[in-house]
């Protein structure tokens, strides 16, 4: 039986679709609102999911992602402020060899799998409209679209990096805006087949450098470098 609660999710990227997918299991009526609903181009980013988050997605019907991901069994942290050193300063390991600390998966693969699932859900509706204003009433949130149509929602979730100007339409009690003054460089390295189940992070003078094991033949490198 459908739930009478109605949810609006602004955005149609991976974060928005994941939220919609998980909430759909409660039979909520969900509108995914985005002015441009063309095929999303997800950046070639590899995602690290905690074991708990990964298990949750699998339990909600995304079991196929298990064979499309790589297990992380060890995480090594290196205090290499002056130069890269393989001396391990801190190590995290799974309780036993059969368990995982985390999983690495391609963002595009996860996005595609969730998109396919969502298309078959009758309680999720895609709305291709531009939002004009968001009004906070006592019992609901009213969204007015540019075509002057209105919709009332019990909850509005903002999950869009493309419509940041809409944040000003939310009456937020507190907004935290932090500038890190860093640029992140991502490299996907393809190499010969190895046992690749360990993640490493080096804390360098110019910023942290991380190695994520994507598969036995691929490693993702992320280097966050200070702008100065």
Predicted segments — roles?
Residues 2-7:
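Extreme N-terminal starter segment of soluble prokaryotic enzymes
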Residues 16-17:
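N-terminal Rossmann-fold NAD(P) dinucleotide-binding loop
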Residues 22, 117, 188:
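Rossmann-fold NAD(P)-dependent oxidoreductase module
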Residues 43-80:
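N-terminal FAD cofactor-binding segment of flavoenzymes
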Residues 159-228:
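Conserved FAD-binding catalytic core of PHBH/FMO-like flavoproteins
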């Amino acid at each position: 039986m459908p739930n009478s609660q109605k949810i609006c999710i602004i955005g149609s990227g991976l974060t928005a679709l994941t939220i919609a997918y998980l909430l759909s299991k409660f039979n909520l009526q969900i509108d995914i609102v985005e002015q441009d609903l063309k095929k999303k181009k997800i950046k070639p980013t590899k995602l690290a999911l905690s074991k708990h988050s990964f298990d949750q997605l699998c339990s909600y019907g995304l079991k196929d992602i298990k064979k499309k991901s790589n297990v992380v069994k060890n995480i090594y942290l290196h205090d290499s402020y002056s130069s890269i050193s393989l001396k391990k300063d801190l190590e995290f390991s799974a309780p036993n060899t059969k368990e995982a600390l985390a999983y690495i998966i391609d963002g595009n693969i996860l996005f595609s799998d969730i998109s396919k699932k969502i298309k078959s859900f009758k309680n999720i509706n895609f709305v291709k409209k531009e939002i004009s204003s968001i009004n906070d009433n006592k019992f609901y949130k009213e969204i007015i679209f540019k075509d002057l149509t209105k919709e009332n929602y019990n909850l509005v979730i903002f999950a869009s990096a493309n419509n940041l100007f809409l944040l000003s339409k939310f009456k937020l009690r507190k907004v935290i805006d932090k500038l890190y003054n860093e640029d992140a460089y991502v490299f996907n390295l393809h190499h010969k087949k190895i046992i690749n189940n360990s993640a490493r992070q080096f804390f360098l003078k110019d910023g942290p450098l991380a190695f994520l094991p994507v598969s036995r033949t691929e490693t993702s490198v992320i280097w966050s470098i200070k702008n100065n």
